[in-house]
């Protein structure tokens, strides 16, 4: 049976007076405690601003960019005390593309390539998003230098114009020079005559992953994983139009302009490209 002690009993046991205890209990927090309280509030603001997705590394770097002096260890401790945890990225599922078609397959041109500027290599892929109306298929084109998504299209089908529209958006945004490498999987949408002709018309070189090896396009797979973990899995879309609007806003207003990337020295894709100017 647990024994209950009065305050007088505890004060006597520790040889302190009741008045001394009350003086200690009522004194204001010290400078360190006050600083931690301020930082904890700022951590909460960053955490909420980024939809409770950021863990301590991104929160720390976001705070530093805002002018706050803090270490990752301190931020991690305060986040733990507040019960704040970043959303864990699930490993992407290995879903290989059906390459059973009679279209030409381009070689993998990414081996040993060194990327030093925008519009050297673009990577492209397709994913799908569930809605109450059925699947919404999303095609994306990313600049491998900055991880910026520069082209996308969303349709309720997997016809070739899905990938063509995403490619055309990227071309209009970037106006690339001849020789740029466009890398994708071996799917028929990327191997089709229309797609190959569009690449040729703009002087772009096709590159494709090895057979049944989605890891050759891991950067795009990682992007889809972020999109689904940070947005799609939190939503229940009634219509494809609702999903389109939500995904558009996440890409254009958040992912490209705000979201920090560890591979970009904790900068957003737009900020990473702007530092070149």
What are these regions (language model features)?
Residues 1-277:
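Charged DNA-binding/catalytic regions of mobile-element recombinases
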């Amino acid at each position: 049976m647990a024994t209950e002690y009065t305050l007088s009993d505890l004060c006597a046991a520790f040889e302190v007076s009741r008045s001394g205890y009350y003086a200690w209990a009522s004194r204001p927090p010290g400078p360190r405690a006050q600083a931690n309280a301020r930082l904890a509030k700022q951590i909460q603001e960053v955490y909420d601003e980024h939809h409770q997705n950021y863990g301590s590394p991104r929160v720390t770097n976001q705070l530093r960019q805002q002018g706050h002096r803090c270490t990752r260890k301190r931020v991690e401790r305060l986040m733990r005390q507040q019960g704040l945890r970043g959303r864990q990225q699930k490993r992407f599922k290995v879903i290989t593309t059906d390459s059973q078609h009679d279209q030409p397959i381009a070689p993998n041109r990414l081996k040993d390539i060194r990327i030093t500027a925008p519009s050297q290599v673009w990577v492209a892929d397709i994913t799908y998003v569930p809605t109450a109306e059925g699947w919404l298929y999303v095609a994306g084109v990313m600049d491998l230098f900055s991880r910026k998504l520069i082209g996308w299209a969303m349709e309720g089908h997997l016809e070739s114009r899905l990938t063509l529209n995403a490619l055309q958006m990227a071309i209009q945004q970037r106006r690339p020079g001849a020789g740029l490498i466009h890398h994708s999987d071996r799917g028929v949408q990327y191997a089709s005559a229309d797609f190959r002709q569009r690449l040729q018309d703009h002087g772009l070189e096709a590159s494709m992953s090895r057979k049944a090896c989605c890891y050759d396009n891991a950067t795009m797979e990682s992007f889809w994983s972020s999109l689904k973990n940070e947005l799609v899995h939190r939503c229940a879309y009634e219509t494809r139009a609702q999903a389109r609007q939500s995904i558009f806003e996440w890409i254009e207003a958040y992912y490209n302009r705000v979201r920090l990337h560890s591979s970009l020295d904790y900068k957003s894709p737009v900020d990473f490209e702007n530092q070149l100017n």
